[in-house]
Amino acid sequence: ILVGGLMLGVLIFLFPPLYGEGYDTINALLTGECYNLFNQSFLYNYRFDAWAIVLYLSLIVFFKIFASAATNGAGGTGGIFAPSLFVGCITGFVVAEGLNIVGLPVPHQNFAFAGMAGLMSGVMHAPLTGTFLIAELTGGYDLFMTLMITSVIAYLTIIVFERHSLYAMRLAQKGELLTHHKDRAVLTLMKMDNVIETDLAIV
């Protein structure tokens, strides 16, 4: 607990947006106030520099992995839903900022929406959930087709490497995951100790 708490404290000191669920960070990015994320950070003096924004947000996404690991290791609950939105929003924003830097003007907000939908669809293995949820939360129905395409691509990509979502992964590893396949479900619920006959006559 001490090591995890110390590690988390150092990360939050260097990258303040890692503190909390991340909804304030998402709101800042969607409202065009990304420079507020630099408050009390070591890159505060570069908060209006485009390259600094890309670097800072990329580091936040990278160290979010360690922050979540430290939280879980210290006995806390890092969650799945909020971190998915957090990382997806920042990733989409970074891609948009990078395209703007190289001379391709694109709206940051739209890319942030697509990033959230894509990451949520991949993590939860639920492309429709990612599409409709982001559209409902943000009112971005004009981007419905974009969100749908992003979600489907994310889902088709992740199932190649991981068959189960994070919610079902632990159950699958324990062999306790119930599926729509009736025979497999029955075999999953069946305890072998109750089936194997042990009272045998010795000849």
Regions inferred by a protein language model and the residue ranges of each:
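Alpha-helical transmembrane segments and immediately membrane-proximal extracytoplasmic
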Residues: 1-194, 198-203
